[in-house]
UniProtKB/Swiss-Prot annotation:
It comes from Thermoplasma volcanium (strain ATCC 51530 / DSM 4299 / JCM 9571 / NBRC 15438 / GSS1). This is GMP synthase [glutamine-hydrolyzing] subunit B. The keyword Membrane does not apply. Pathway: Purine metabolism; GMP biosynthesis; GMP from XMP (L-Gln route): step 1/1. Heterodimer composed of a glutamine amidotransferase subunit (A) and a GMP-binding subunit (B). Residues 1-187 form the GMPS ATP-PPase domain. PANTHER family: GMP SYNTHASE [GLUTAMINE-HYDROLYZING], GMP SYNTHASE-RELATED. Pfam families: GMP_synt_C, NAD_synthase. It comes from the Archaea. GO terms for cellular component: cytosol. Coiled coil: none annotated.
């Protein structure tokens, strides 16, 4: 079956499943971007695309998603809920607890938008690895996914998941077929919160946002899109180490760099970039962000590790 056939099947699924107004949360990642575009083509103004600025996003994420909505003439709203999310995460260090708090807060904000719009259906970009890792079909739960299991039992919206049988390579193939960018970096629903080990604060988010921008920029500059790792990102660690800034001792923060090669996100191997690229990334981070004085590289495959650290 071709990617064009997959697209037709998904649109038929949406057409047959939704008989009224629907809402979809768009993160800017590949899954929700693809689904929102296909659903918009089927439902028109009966679909409301909602982008929630959680304060846990990468640099320029809001502007990029707004441009996507405008380019495709989609019906959308952008909600700034950053303060709510960050306040709800105060004092929380457990990764599962973080995910659940973010999921509940997200649904609360989304439900308000759904009520205002009069939506009866919730479209969600859940794909196969999401529900498999979340304990679907009698598997043990590896970790809760933002798209899976976070919906309240008394939710009045009917859930529709047209992508749940598809894998990442198929999502990318369909995106390419539609002319969507295929080099969009996968980004977890809970955002940078699960790339900060320990408590999430605005200061840590600002640091990690700057580091993430450097990592993505340096890899984009060094490698053509077809040669880049499948996913690459930074993690802020709760580890301070001794270093030197100028002629003074410094006790700075540590970041980990993760680059992974995979086709379906179910298994993967760590990427083996050039030493020159790793050195350039490390030097740029420590030069531009004085709070950080150590950069480490993650050489763990999946399994035993998951792609994200939390």
């Amino acid at each position: 079956m071709s990617f064009s056939d997959y697209i037709s099947r998904i649109k038929d699924n949406i057409r047959n499943s939704i008989k009224g107004k629907a809402i979809i949360a768009v993160s800017g990642g590949q899954d929700s971007s693809l689904l929102s575009l296909l659903a918009s083509e089927v439902l028109g103004n009966n679909l409301l695309c909602v982008f929630i600025d959680t304060g846990l996003l990468r640099k320029n994420e809001t502007g990029r998603v707004k441009d996507f909505f405008e380019k495709h003439s989609m019906n959308y709203v952008i909600v700034d809920a950053a303060d709510t999310f960050i306040n709800n995460l105060k004092g929380v260090t457990d990764p599962e607890e973080k995910r659940k708090i973010i999921g509940k807060t997200f649904i609360d904000v989304l439900s308000e938008q759904a009520q205002n719009f009069g939506a009866e259906y919730l479209l969600q970009g859940t794909i196969a690895p999401d529900w498999i890792e979340s304990g679907g079909q009698k598997r043990d739960t590896i970790k809760s996914h933002h798209n899976v299991g976070g919906l309240p039992k008394d939710m009045k919206l009917k859930l529709v998941e047209p992508l749940r049988d598809y894998y990442k390579d198929e999502i990318r193939g369909m995106s390419k077929e539609l002319g969507l960018p295929t080099d969009i970096q996968p980004f977890p629903g809970p955002g940078l919160a699960v790339r900060i080990i320990g408590e999430v604060t605005k200061e840590k988010l600002d640091l990690l946002r700057a580091v993430t921008d450097i990592v993505e920029r340096k890899i984009s500059e060094a490698m053509p899109s077809e040669s880049r790792p499948w996913q690459y990102f930074a993690v802020l660690l709760p580890v301070r180490t001794t270093g030197v800034h100028g002629d003074r001792r410094a006790y700075g923060l540590t970041v980990g760099i993760r680059m992974i090669e995979t086709t379906d996100a179910m298994t993967g191997t760590f990427s083996k970039p050039s030493w020159d690229l790793l050195e350039d990334i490390s030097n740029t981070i420590t030069d531009e962000i004085p709070e950080i004085n150590r950069v480490v590289y993650d050489i763990t495959n999946k399994p035993p590790a998951t792609i994200e650290w939390e």
